Amino acid sequence: MAKVAKDLNPGVQKMSLGQQQSARGVPCLRCKGTCSGFEPHSWRKICKSCKCSQEDHFLSSDLEDDRKIGRLLMDSKYSTLTARVKGGDGIRIYKRNRMIMTNPIATGKDPTFDTITYEWAPPGVTQKLGLQYMELIPKEKQPVTGTEGAYYRRRQLMHQLPIYDQDPSRCRGLLESELKVMEEFVKQYKSEALGVGEVALPGQGGLPKEEGKQQEKPEGAETAAPTANGSLGDPSKEYVCELCKGVAPADSPVVYSDRAGYSKQWHPACFVCAKCSEPLVDLIYFWKDGAPWCGRHYCESLRPRCSGCDEIIFSEDYQRVEDLAWHRKHFVCEGCEQQLGGRAYIITKGQLLCPTCSKSKRT
């Protein structure tokens, strides 16, 4: 049972509304023209006009995404995937790997080229292996610039890896005591759970890479694939996907997790969150209970998430109803915004409403 609420001071409140304000008026992609344009709520991560989420209106920029992932991976064993920002006071940025494919098109005398840019590609692999990996992902989720797949990736970066799950300055009203709890929480998951999947041929996970490139078996070679310790494996060995239990062909890339150990592998399309079953964006995962999780659901499995502001709750004093939780100050009606602590309320499809607003929604 939650304790009696105390008066909360503003505490640590550094989050800038600059991005929200600059997106003011942006139409909602979900409402298809019925929304008058993005109107930021003062503390919910939604539009006041249509109640849809921020990511239904706008997405963070490439630079913001790369800074966010750089911050996530810094101070972890994956910091080699980041680079220091010159004059950035120790800030690190994600060294996102892109892949550009250029194919000539035969059209008359002047040659033309068809160029495809993947906004993200697995690091440390040859272009051939990277392309094989992409072909094993559903086409609508391939992060090709200007396509639905690129939009899907950027949306998942916002949803699976919320900036306010790792950066206290992006949380609203943290008390000093909560700030310390959050800092320890982040430090612990970076040390014990955070991981980045590795793409390799079956049996080659964990092997050293030459100049950052994954080694490939020569065309037509019949040699056995090396094991993780560098010795030659049994050429007749079957490699099985950890999720679907299907066979992984020896010439087809798989995903490895060093948290799981290199005896386990996943088909590229099977490396998904154990909770929501969505592909793990940029292969970033959190290891828990013998499976990879996305950042959002990993954090929620350890601490409650406020159904009002979407931030993790780092206080022991909060409101819980069934499997939902709220900061006490956010236990308010989603319709009229009145405080509902000690008052009648109704929860319908995850929405917290006062009786009056609930009745008006039904009529």
From Swiss-Prot:
InterPro entries: PET_domain, PET_testin, Pk/Esn/Tes, Znf_LIM. Residues 99-206 form the PET domain. It is found in: Cytoplasm; Nucleus. Residues 208-220 have a biased composition (Basic and acidic residues). Residues 200-233 are annotated as: Disordered. This is LIM and cysteine-rich domains protein 1. Interacts with beta-dystroglycan. Interacts with GATA1, GATA4 and GATA6. It comes from the Eukaryota. Keywords: Cytoplasm, LIM domain, Metal-binding, Nucleus, Phosphoprotein, Repeat, Repressor, Transcription, Transcription regulation, Zinc. The modification Phosphoserine is found at S16. The LIM zinc-binding domains and the Cys-rich region mediate interaction with GATA6. Coiled coil: none annotated. SUPFAM superfamilies: Glucocorticoid receptor-like (DNA-binding domain) (SSF57716). Highly expressed in both skeletal muscle and cardiac muscle. Its main location: cytoplasm. Residues 239-304, 305-363 form the LIM zinc-binding domain. The keyword Repeat applies. GO terms for cellular component: cytoplasm; nucleus. GO terms for molecular function: transcription corepressor activity; zinc ion binding. One of its GO terms (biological process) is positive regulation of calcineurin-NFAT signaling cascade. Transcriptional cofactor that restricts GATA6 function by inhibiting DNA-binding, resulting in repression of GATA6 transcriptional activation of downstream target genes. Represses GATA6-mediated trans activation of lung- and cardiac tissue-specific promoters. Inhibits DNA-binding by GATA4 and GATA1 to the cTNC promoter. Plays a critical role in the development of cardiac hypertrophy via activation of calcineurin/nuclear factor of activated T-cells signaling pathway.
